């Protein structure tokens, strides 16, 4: 917990205002099971990351989700062949 004092002037007199920021350690768990700690102001102890670099199909080409992208490439090539001369 960090605590700092800040002086500010209000109606011609100085006052002391305390500004308190509480930080918590948070564990972020990636899709592949790896985790790391981050200091944050969110009081949640952990976050399960749904989308990260370990489960995105473009970053991890071994994932089966790329089959739909390959299917779109073949559809696009058929479309380009059909309307090539226009």
From Swiss-Prot:
One cellular component (GO) term of this entry: mitochondrial large ribosomal subunit
Keywords assigned: Mitochondrion, Ribonucleoprotein, Ribosomal protein, Transit peptide
Transit peptide location: 1-18
Induction field: Differentially expressed during meiosis.
PANTHER family named in the record: 54S RIBOSOMAL PROTEIN L36, MITOCHONDRIAL (PTHR28174), LARGE RIBOSOMAL SUBUNIT PROTEIN BL31M (PTHR28174:SF1)
Family to which the UniProt record says this protein belongs: Belongs to the bacterial ribosomal protein bL31 family. Highly divergent.
Taxon lineage: Eukaryota, Fungi, Dikarya, Ascomycota, Taphrinomycotina
Self-association state and partner proteins as the record states: Component of the mitochondrial large ribosomal subunit (mt-LSU). Mature yeast 74S mitochondrial ribosomes consist of a small (37S) and a large (54S) subunit. The 37S small subunit contains a 15S ribosomal RNA (15S mt-rRNA) and at least 32 different proteins. The 54S large subunit contains a 21S rRNA (21S mt-rRNA) and at least 45 different proteins.
UniProt-listed InterPro entries: Ribosomal_bL31m (IPR034600)
Key word Mitochondrion present: yes
Known role: Component of the mitochondrial ribosome (mitoribosome), a dedicated translation machinery responsible for the synthesis of mitochondrial genome-encoded proteins, including at least some of the essential transmembrane subunits of the mitochondrial respiratory chain. The mitoribosomes are attached to the mitochondrial inner membrane and translation products are cotranslationally integrated into the membrane.
Entry's localization field: Mitochondrion
GO molecular function: structural constituent of ribosome
Protein name: Large ribosomal subunit protein bL31m
Organism of origin: Schizosaccharomyces pombe (strain 972 / ATCC 24843) (Fission yeast)
One Gene Ontology term from the biological process aspect of the record: mitochondrial translation
Highest taxon above the source species: Eukaryota
